[in-house]
C-alpha cells in the first residue's frame, strides 16, 4: 500500500509553533522522497524553511528558529503534492499533562460558563490529544479528526481549565501567542506517563511492572475487555446509587454512603488496554506529539499516588528526564502543581497527601529548570476536584514567568534550613512570613525521640521563625502543614502561603 503524504494534525491550520527554537515538523511520506517545508508571513516573507528525506514512511523537518508571528502559512511539499496549513502562529507551546485536576474542563470550572460565552482571545490556542488507551482504528480516526482551536466565544469548553487560566495570564503578560497541547487522563498514576525505558531505569519503576504482571496485566486483550465492560456496569450502578442517596439525603457523609451501598469499586481491572497500566498512556497519547518543540511542560498529578509516596519523587524525576529526552531538550522547563488540601468527610487524616507534597518538592529541587506552584491555601473539603482552577493556573503562570522568562513574579516563601538554640528550633526562610488570625499554625517540632508535638510559641522575626514547645526540651526536627486537610495561617507579604516543609535530619 502506498504511503500517503500528509502532515500530522498537530501542524494543521491554527497551529502554534514554538518561537526561538528549532521547530520539528513531521508527517508521512514514501521512503526516499524529498520533503520541503517553509513558514511564510501573510505578505510572503519566508520566516523559516528546511528540507529532509523521508525514511521508514515518515519525514521530519527541522525548521530554523523564528521570532514571534501570527497569521502565517506552513507549506510542506513532496514532489507534486502540497500540504498547506493556514493561520499559523509562532509563540510559546506548552504540554499540559497529568490527571483529573488538569483534565477538569473549563466548562466545569468556576467562571467557566461566562468565559466560554464571552472570552475572545486571539493569543490563546489549544490542541486536545485524543484520550485513547489502545492504538486501534478508533484511535487513528480520533487523531485524524483532532485539530487546533482558538479561545473565542462558544469555544474552549473542553480545554483544561488550569491550562486555560495559565495561558490567559501568560498571553496577557508577555503579549505572545500561547499554544497548549492538552494530554491528560483522570485517575492516572505517574507510571502511566512513563515508558518502559523510564520505568526500567529505576528499582521503583521495575516494582510497578512486576506488580502489574502479578495482577494479571499480561492477560489476553479480549479477556481484559470483558472484565472492563463488567467493571463499568458495576461502577455505573454504584454511581447511580450514590447520586440517588445524595439527592434523597442532602449532607449524607461518605461513611454513611459506603455503609449503605458498599465501598466504591474503583480501580478498573488491569490489562493490556487499561489506561491505568504502567507505561500505557505515554505510548498512546504523549508520544503522538513527540518530538514536538516545546517551551515547557505543565503537570498536575499525584492524587492517585498518595498511597505510594515513598518512591514518588524518584518516579516523577525519571518521568521528566525521559520526557526531556523524547522532546529533545535536556533543559525543558517542568512546571508542576503541588497538591492542595483535601480530605474526604469522615476519613482519618493519614498524612499521605502531606507526604506526596513533600515528594513533589524534592522532585522540584532535582528537576531544574522547573518550579512548583504552591496551593496549600487551596482545596475543598470532601471534594477532590476543586472547581477553582484560576488560582492553580495563575500561580503556575507565575512559576513560568520566573523560571522560563526570568521575570519578577510572586513566589511562596520557602523554608531553607533549621538550627537549634537550646529549647528553641529556628527555621530560616526565603522571605518573611506573617501569621493571620484565622487558620491553624500547623507547626510541629520533635526531639531525638521523633515524637512530634504542636508548637506552642512562635516568634516571627524577618526571615526566621523561632519555635518552642514545653513538651520538647531540645528540638531537632520540624515539619509544617503535615496534614491532608487544614487551614493555614502563615503567608508571605505577597499573600502567598508558606510552602510545606519537613526537616527531620
Residue ranges with predicted function:
Residues 1-505:
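Cell-envelope and extracellular/periplasmic
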